[in-house]
Design a protein with these regions (language model features):
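Short, compositionally biased
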Residues: 1-124
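C-terminal, surface-exposed recognition/capping segments
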Residues: 1-10, 110, 125-127, 133-169
Length: 169
């Protein structure tokens, strides 16, 4: 059984006979399941064991998005094209990388960067996406040493049909 609760994935390995005896609704409503916000993050830029990557910062709730921990994968894809030259109005959010990535994938199956990010898995987490423009800015401010200084990093925030916002370090 796998539960996804407020940006935290919980994996339970139980025999199938035990599943019939568990009232998951009661467990969740009792508050006994810890969310990612009950965990203490490591120092900025350090690998967060069990969370799938390096902790960057905690973003407050902003413009309709919930508060969330920003975690970057420990693996980078090199030399991926951003995607085809297609205007994707749903990929213009400065803050919501998940929404942008989903929009890019919906608009084109040939979007190599969005496809790579959405298929990435680590520490049992499979909810990765391309970073938004704000996510990359926070990485620049909070953990620049994690990134190559000779490279530009694509965001999921599309600027035009031919370009997205990028960040250098």
């Amino acid at each position: 059984m796998q539960l996804h609760i407020a940006h935290a994935t919980i994996n339970l390995q139980l025999p199938s006979s035990a599943l019939e005896q568990i009232d998951v609704t009661n467990i969740l409503s009792s508050g006994s399941v810890a969310s990612a916000f009950d965990l203490t993050p490591p120092a900025r830029g350090k690998y967060w064991a069990g969370q799938g990557g390096h902790y960057i910062c905690t973003q407050p709730a902003l413009l309709g998005l919930p508060a969330r921990h920003v975690i970057f994968s420990s693996t980078e894809a090199k030399d991926l094209a951003f995607g085809p030259s297609v205007d994707v109005p749903g990929a213009r959010s400065q803050l919501d990388g998940r929404r942008n990535t989903d929009a890019l994938l919906s608009a084109s199956r040939d979007h190599a960067a969005a496809k790579w990010a959405s298929e990435y898995q680590a520490d049992g987490h499979s909810d990765f996406h391309l970073p938004s423009r704000m996510d990359l800015l926070m990485a620049y401010v909070c953990a620049p040493s994690l990134f190559e200084t000779s490279s530009w990093y694509w965001s999921s925030t599309q600027l035009s049909r031919n370009c997205a916002f990028v960040q250098d370090f």
